[in-house]
């Protein structure tokens, strides 16, 4: 257990109150029949002095003062462990709660880190307990000794989790021994005695009489053969040790504290006893100074019955002995190896990349500030040094295995956690702090050492460490200019950077370059703004520290409107515009809205956000790259609400996002946070690289792929993949280690030429990325060979500045390359360093990348430009309230010279399903799709014959139909009438060309029950089947409706439930609009239908036509027999026959949880969701609350509320 999250209590400087071994202290066994003696005596130490427990004494003893500070930090550590216990182990008994007064939920990173720390220790202890021993070890009692235990509850957890392995209740079962400061052990003993849940599992409890015990009733204690109950425990002390030189004092009654809180603060009347203070069959407490190994061994010998050789030991030191002076800690390790058949589990910190690494420096600074420095890490900073530490101290003849926690997370042997267990962790709480978890886990190691090797387990397979220095990769030192940004300005991570150019108002019209870092996570919360930096000229001799801000010639502003606050989004440079895609609020709230940042007409300094086509599903940590010099982009992977997005999408400005067909035998692993870059552009194809990313099992994927995208048919793009082989340096050695350097999570991939690209930052599997390997220049040859050309190592150009920040942490940064000179700017970034503070990259660093061929140790020239932070600009969320200008068409419509607009309609993609999961994925994505090639039964071949259908239904069957006098029915104005007629007559009139429409209702109770084809038309229903690929529809069926129509349009409306429209006979043209278009299409409050005739209005010449063409995003599909249209909920749609008649089956199903739908009757499946109905009621109440205000004030505030609601709606994608 550790400090403010991270410090442990190892041992104390106090001497034992009784000389254990020379004079055995008196003990008491408490039962109903025997009460404790009420007398107390003053004990003396072995040097004849009277011990005291003076809280102020530590001021005179620096070593005692430091011990007290280490001991005091236990309280924070157990709060974090209690948070883990409650969240991650809901179905187990909870024991930390007895040591933590008030539950505090920690941040996900702290919870995940502490959970894994605890889990790794638990696995190694479990393995020790469950191992079947042979030979000399067979039959030996297993003893687990927790060195620096603090308030850990390992004994009770093991007794509850592994009762058979512990042989709970048996005298020769496993025994657990807690060792720590006497003062801390004293408090822990009191808690145990006062808590029935802790005392209950223990049998034959004995508390030595010199050990003070609480004056409150204790729990029931069950002995092996007799049940005994302690009814009242009062504070006592043993008689003086035989080593005392003074006569025993007259026993005095110990005063009872008035309340526990005061007692906890008051000095103890006697020193906390040293040695054994609590024993039972299963559990022992020893208060002891770990630097006094003689006393520790003496106490341990007594704890196990006097014969150490009859036991096999497991010593656990979870970040505890590292607070001791290193020689003392090493002595503990050496001593433990001398006890025969022993194991040692050590968990403590590492410095894998040295003390200057940003995480390491933050960690070391944290412990120094607490006056609890970790000492072992200076001598044993690496895995290799820890191995040698144990091998040279008595463990060399057995086996020593060391994992960093990051290695343990991904251990190929599933030693600690397997893929299914890693996946289950994501169900506990949303988690997206992977880089920070990797940094933490790379700076901690767990050692498992054994004095006796097990068969087949004596060696750990050495895999090597991915290190460019060891691989012999060339180095190029790149000069970096650093420009300071005062205060906390510029501190944001997981933002997105962009370079914008603006013309200067001067006569030369010189372009000014601006660098933006957009939104992201700030020091306290996600940010709704962006930082704007301006470029400044730097003289050859300039060594300025970057603190002077200059006024630049061109101001910078945003027009009102833009994306809502987010992080983990992307910005892709199209030259004249920037495409912002997705991102997230919390990890459970991904976003799907997309925006273009463009210069406004007639302005050189004003930029505006314009909403463009949304993603098919919300995504964050996706990978996006611009395709050559076009305005198209390729998107790969990303994280959705619950799953990783498996598809690749092409962004085409006029068509929106189009799913790519993944062809060929090589399929990429579904990941997020991967690196993606486009390197080459041909006439109708593009190619590039795709590497790494995090898969659904929580591991970084080992994938290095070259991809090729064919866009010869832009509506059906095809992408193929080829695996890449890595040549490391000039000799191609150690490919596996080189692959580890390239397969990253959270890195950036920056194209440099048709063959070269940079891999920048991020984290890698198993190991900490060395600071010299963070920026790699790579080259891709046409034969599929990938070479790491060289490592680019930043070397500060102005490191003489007293405020120079030192090494950067390349996590959450926004790397941007300027188009004019190829410089690489690094802005923002940093990480939460577990519980030890947050490291922020300061200022902005500029690397000159337009370099000649590199020579070893030859540095690049100093960048010629620096940067100043000009201002932070707010982004007002929501779309601009003004209507689009004439000839501006946000949906891709083209403006004509005469003012009319030619509407651009996006075709609905057509796909073939392989299985039911394919359809489930489509439903989750919530975008319309035409499904081809499904087997709907005999209906497709038979129902085109009207006579056949009439005979199947029954010619005299009465049905209610719509009879219209116009080609376009309007539900709002009811320009049709309901007519009851015979089905045979209806079919004859349809074939004759009458404007008729049938939407079948339930036969039995048409006003109460939804229609179901099998119930209402059983003879006809035998011809229609839902194919197995649509199993989800059948499982969640709400209704299935027969639809037959003549030459008449169905009005524009939306369905609250998802549905599949199965075209059986004839053909229809369907026009769909996304839900976000609802405000433009004439839907009255509470109405699900509109009076707009889309087919005449959208394609007309009127002002309404131009307006709709500009502001809506129509999608189109022509349905022919056998086609199935998936209609997501709330997509507005209308239809017109393209044949003389049409017949279809429309199947509705529930795609949301039941509680989302409104309660009560819903015959058509079209009743609005419960939240909307409640919202309308709330809206009326809110409006009524303004009735007493003057009319102008009422209008003013209601309009402001309406605007706020609108902004929230646009931001909550």
From Swiss-Prot:
Composition-biased stretches (Basic and acidic residues): 53-67
Reactions catalysed: 7-[(3S)-3-amino-3-carboxypropyl]wyosine(37) in tRNA(Phe) + S-adenosyl-L-methionine = 7-[(3S)-(3-amino-3-methoxycarbonyl)propyl]wyosine(37) in tRNA(Phe) + S-adenosyl-L-homocysteine; 7-[(3S)-(3-amino-3-methoxycarbonyl)propyl]wyosine(37) in tRNA(Phe) + S-adenosyl-L-methionine + CO2 = wybutosine(37) in tRNA(Phe) + S-adenosyl-L-homocysteine + 2 H(+)
Chain segments carrying region Disordered: 1-76, 215-272, 879-900
UniProt EC number: 2.1.1.290, 2.3.1.231
PROSITE patterns: JMJC
Any single biological process term in GO: tRNA methylation
Keyword check for Transferase: yes
Ranges of Low complexity composition bias in the record: 1-13, 39-52, 215-248
Domain JmjC: 1006-1166
InterPro entries: Cupin_8, Gal_Oxase/kelch_b-propeller, JmjC_dom, Kelch-typ_b-propeller, Kelch_2, Ppm1/Ppm2/Tcmp, SAM-dependent_MTases_sf
Alphabetized Pfam families for the sequence: Cupin_8, Kelch_2, LCM
Keyword Nucleotide-binding attributed: no
Gene Ontology MF terms in the entry: tRNA methyltransferase activity
Family: Belongs to the methyltransferase superfamily. LCMT family.
PANTHER family associated with the record: TRNA WYBUTOSINE-SYNTHESIZING PROTEIN 4
Protein name: tRNA wybutosine-synthesizing protein 4
Origin species: Neurospora crassa (strain ATCC 24698 / 74-OR23-1A / CBS 708.71 / DSM 1257 / FGSC 987)
Gene it is expressed from: lcm-2
């Amino acid at each position: 257990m550790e400090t403010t999250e991270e410090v442990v209590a190892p041992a104390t400087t106090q001497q034992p109150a009784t000389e254990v071994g020379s004079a055995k202290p008196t003990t008491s066994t408490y039962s109903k029949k025997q009460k404790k003696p009420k007398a107390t005596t003053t004990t003396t130490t072995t040097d004849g002095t009277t011990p005291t427990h003076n809280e102020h004494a530590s001021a005179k003893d620096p070593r005692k003062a430091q011990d007290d500070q280490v001991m005091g930090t236990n309280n924070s550590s157990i709060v974090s462990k209690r948070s883990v216990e409650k969240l991650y182990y809901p179905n187990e008994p909870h024991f930390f709660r007895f040591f933590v007064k008030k539950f505090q939920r920690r941040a996900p990173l702290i919870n995940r880190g502490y959970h894994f720390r605890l889990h790794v220790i638990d696995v190694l202890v479990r393995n020790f307990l469950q191992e079947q021993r042979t030979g000399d070890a067979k039959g030996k009692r297993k003893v687990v000794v927790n060195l620096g235990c603090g308030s850990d509850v390992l004994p009770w957890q093991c007794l509850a989790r592994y009762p058979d392995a512990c042989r709970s209740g048996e005298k020769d079962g496993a025994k657990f021994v807690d060792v720590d400061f006497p003062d801390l052990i004293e408090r822990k003993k009191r808690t145990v005695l006062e808590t029935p849940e802790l005392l209950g599992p223990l049998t034959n409890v004995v508390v030595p009489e010199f050990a003070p015990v609480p004056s409150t009733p204790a729990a029931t204690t069950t002995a092996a053969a007799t049940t005994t109950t302690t009814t009242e425990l009062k504070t006592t002390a043993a008689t003086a040790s035989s080593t005392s030189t003074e006569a025993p004092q007259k026993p005095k009654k110990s005063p009872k504290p008035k309340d526990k809180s005061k007692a906890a603060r008051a000095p103890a009347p006697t020193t906390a006893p040293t040695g054994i203070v609590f024993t039972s069959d299963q559990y022992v407490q020893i208060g002891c100074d770990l630097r006094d190994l003689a006393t520790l061994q003496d106490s341990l010998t007594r704890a196990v019955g006097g014969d150490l050789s009859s036991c096999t030991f497991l010593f656990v030191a979870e970040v505890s002995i590292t607070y001791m002076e290193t020689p003392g800690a090493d002595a503990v390790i050496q001593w433990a190896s001398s006890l025969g058949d022993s194991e040692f589990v050590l968990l403590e910190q590492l410095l894998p990349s040295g003390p200057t690494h940003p995480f390491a420096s933050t960690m070391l600074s944290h412990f120094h500030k607490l006056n609890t420095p970790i000492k072992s890490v200076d001598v044993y900073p690496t895995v290799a040094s820890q191995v040698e530490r144990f091998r040279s101290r008595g463990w060399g003849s057995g086996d020593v295995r060391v994992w960093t926690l990051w290695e343990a997370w991904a251990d190929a042997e599933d030693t600690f956690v397997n893929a299914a267990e890693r996946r289950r962790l994501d169900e506990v709480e949303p988690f997206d702090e992977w880089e920070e978890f990797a940094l933490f886990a790379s700076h901690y190691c767990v050692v498992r050492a054994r004095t006796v090797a097990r068969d087949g387990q004596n060696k750990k397979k050495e895999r090597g460490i991915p290190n460019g220095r060891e691989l012999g990769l060339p180095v190029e030192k790149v000069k970096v200019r650093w420009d300071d940004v005062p205060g906390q300005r510029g501190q944001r991570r997981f933002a997105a950077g962009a370079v914008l150019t603006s013309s200067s108002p001067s006569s030369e019209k010189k372009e000014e370059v601006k660098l933006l870092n957009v939104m992201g996570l700030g020091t306290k919360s996600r940010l709704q703004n962006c930082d704007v930096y301006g470029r400044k000229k730097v003289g050859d001799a300039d060594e300025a520290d970057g603190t002077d801000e200059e006024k630049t010639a061109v101001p910078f502003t945003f027009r009102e409107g833009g994306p809502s606050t987010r992080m983990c989004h992307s910005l892709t440079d199209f030259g004249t515009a920037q495409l912002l895609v997705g991102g997230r609020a919390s990890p459970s709230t991904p976003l799907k809205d997309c925006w273009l940042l463009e210069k406004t007409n007639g302005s050189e300094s004003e930029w505006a956000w314009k909403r463009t086509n949304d993603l098919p599903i919300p995504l964050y940590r996706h990978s996006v790259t611009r395709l050559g010099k076009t305005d198209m982009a390729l998107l790969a992977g990303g994280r959705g609400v619950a799953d990783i997005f498996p598809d690749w999408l092409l962004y085409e400005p006029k068509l929106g996002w189009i799913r790519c067909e993944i062809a060929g035998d090589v399929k990429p692993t579904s990941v997020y946070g991967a690196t993606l870059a486009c390197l080459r552009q041909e006439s109708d194809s593009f190619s590039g690289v795709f590497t790494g990313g995090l898969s659904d099992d929580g591991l970084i994927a080992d994938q290095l792929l070259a991809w090729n995208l064919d866009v010869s048919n832009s509506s059906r793009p095809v992408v193929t993949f080829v695996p890449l082989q890595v040549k490391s340096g000039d000799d191609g050695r150690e490919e596996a280690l080189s692959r580890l350097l390239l397969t990253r999570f959270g890195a950036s991939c920056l194209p440099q030429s048709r063959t070269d690209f940079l891999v920048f930052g991020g984290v890698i599997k198993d190991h900490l990325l060395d600071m010299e390997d963070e920026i790699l220049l790579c080259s891709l040859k046409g034969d599929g060979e990938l070479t790491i050309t060289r490592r680019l190592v930043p070397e500060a150009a102005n490191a003489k500045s007293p405020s120079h920040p030192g090494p950067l942490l390349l996590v959450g940064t926004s790397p941007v390359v300027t188009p004019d000179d190829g410089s690489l700017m690094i802005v923002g970034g940093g990480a939460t360093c577990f519980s030890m503070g947050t490291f922020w990259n300061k200022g902005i660093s500029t690397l000159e990348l337009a370099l000649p061929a590199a020579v070893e140790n030859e540095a690049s020239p100093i960048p010629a430009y620096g940067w100043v932070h000009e201002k932070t600009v707010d982004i007002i969320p929501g779309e601009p309230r003004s209507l689009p200008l004439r000839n501006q068409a946000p949906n891709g419509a083209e403006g004509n010279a005469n003012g009319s607009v030619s509407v651009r309609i996006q075709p609905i993609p057509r796909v073939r399903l392989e299985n039911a999961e394919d359809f489930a994925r489509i439903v989750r994505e919530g975008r319309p799709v035409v499904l081809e090639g499904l087997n709907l039964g005999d209906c497709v071949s038979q129902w085109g014959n009207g006579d056949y259908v009439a005979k199947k239904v029954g010619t005299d069957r009465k049905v209610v139909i719509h009879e219209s006098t116009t080609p376009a029915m309007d539900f709002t104005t009811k320009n049709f009438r309901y007519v009851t007629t015979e089905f045979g007559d209806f079919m004859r009139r349809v074939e004759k060309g009458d404007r008729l429409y049938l939407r079948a209702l339930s036969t039995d109770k048409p006003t109460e029950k939804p229609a179901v084809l099998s119930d209402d038309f059983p003879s006809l229903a035998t011809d229609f089947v839902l194919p197995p690929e649509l199993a989800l529809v059948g499982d969640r069926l709400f209704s299935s409706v027969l639809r037959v129509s003549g030459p008449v349009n169905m009005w524009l409306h939306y369905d609250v439930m998802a549905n599949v429209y199965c075209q059986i006979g004839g053909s229809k043209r369907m026009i769909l609009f996304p839900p976000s278009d609802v405000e433009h299409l004439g839907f009255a409050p509470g109405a699900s239908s509109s009076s707009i005739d889309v087919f005449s209005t959208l394609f007309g010449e009127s002002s309404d036509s131009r307006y709709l063409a500009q502001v809506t995003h129509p999608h189109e599909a022509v349905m022919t027999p056998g086609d199935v249209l998936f209609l997501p909920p709330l997509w507005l749609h209308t239809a017109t026959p393209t044949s003389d008649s049409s017949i279809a089956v429309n199947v509705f199903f529930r795609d949301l949880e039941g509680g989302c739908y409104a309660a009560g009757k819903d015959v058509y499946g079209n009743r609005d969701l419960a939240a909307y109905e409640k919202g309308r009621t709330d809206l009326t109440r809110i409006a009524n609350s303004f009735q007493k205000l003057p009319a102008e004030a009422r209008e003013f505030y209601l309009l402001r509320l309406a605007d706020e609601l609108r902004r929230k709606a646009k931001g909550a994608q």
